[in-house]
Amino acid sequence: MKGVLFIVASLVAFATGQDCPAYYVRSQSGQSCYRYFNMRVPYRMASEFCEMVTPCGNGPAKMGALASVSSPQENMEIYQLVAGFSQDNQMENEVWLGWNSMSPFFWEDGTPAYPNGFAAFSSSGMAPPRPGAPPSRAWPVNPQNPMSGPPGRAPVMKRQNPPVRPGQGGRQIPQGVGPQWEAVEVTAMRAFVCEVPAGRNVPIGQQPGMGQGFGNQQPGFGNQPGMGGRQPGFGNQPGMGGRQPGFGNQPGMGGRQPGFGNQPGVGGRQPGFGNQPGMGGRQPGFGNQPGVGGRQPGFGNQPGMGGQQPGVGGRQPGFGNQPGMGGNQPGMGGQQPGMGGRQPGVGGRQPGMGGQQPGMGGRQPGMGGQQPNNPNNPNNPNNPNNPNNPNPRFNRPRMLQEADALA
């Protein structure tokens, strides 16, 4: 159940740019937003659910809570909100209010409760009494003071049960009659009403936060801080294109201090992804010293891809010229021992595979060479086509001459 409540709270807390969260109703005073939840849960679960709701707009940085009642008008307003969901426009379900006997001097939102418990408010703020009834004595709360009751209780708001009148059957509450409260055990299952402070509709870009936004002068996504702003965050200090640490110039993309900027940054001048070090930079890293196309060790010239020292295509040991792919010294395709080099190695000119000296395919003794043990060498005395072959078994010309003589 808690997981379901959390998901619902996340959805209802979504700010739509209004002064109240989605599906909340702003109070007549303009200070609060209410929403009735027709889910029967214990008091503590209802309280935790309301605390997950965040305010909207430029309202106070205060989370939601179970509804607290600070005036007779607010008492009647909450009652009418809940009653509006009933078929007969009356309150069908009892709802939790944000107070409990374990902390009797404060409402759930932190505001003080009345010193004498839930004493009646002045009758000056009450709705007019029903026709024919005497003036209202005040806020219609049960005579029992909840503060004097046993612990582990919390008040619920419910409709009054007026005397049965002809034609009403006891089902209708006459206009002007408000709800009553009753303290029940906190483990009971009741519906509830959440309250969250109302925000103010402020044009985007004038206040802190998201607009107060792009290119503005207050913290958030604006200039202080914001994208293109001048203080820490996504702005200049720090921000994209800014001048202090972060994604700006100090540090930032194209900035002048460490980070993704010039010091360090893409194309920057100090360590990182910039020139010192960075892509295309001049010191160690991915830049010139070292880096792609750089001049010191790494992926640059010393050593690096296309560099002048060890690396791919370089002139010193490694995958470059000394030794390396296509290099001048030992390595793959180099001019010294290595694959295709000019000294011992695969395809070299000295001992090795395909070289010009002993080795596979070379020009000196070895496999495929032009020296002894090669049967195709005309100077090889073991070649059967050599007329100077002393062995008659393998000297074909002599064998043919002897055969003609015998014939």
Curated annotation (Swiss-Prot):
One of its GO terms (cellular component) is extracellular region. It comes from the Eukaryota. Residues 29-160 form the C-type lectin domain. Keywords: Repeat, Secreted, Signal. Residues 143-176, 204-407 are annotated as: Disordered. It is found in: Secreted. Residues 1-17 form the signal peptide. Residues 370-398 have a biased composition (Low complexity). The repetitive domain may provide a calcite binding matrix. Belongs to the SM50 family. This is 41 kDa spicule matrix protein. It comes from Hemicentrotus pulcherrimus (Sea urchin).
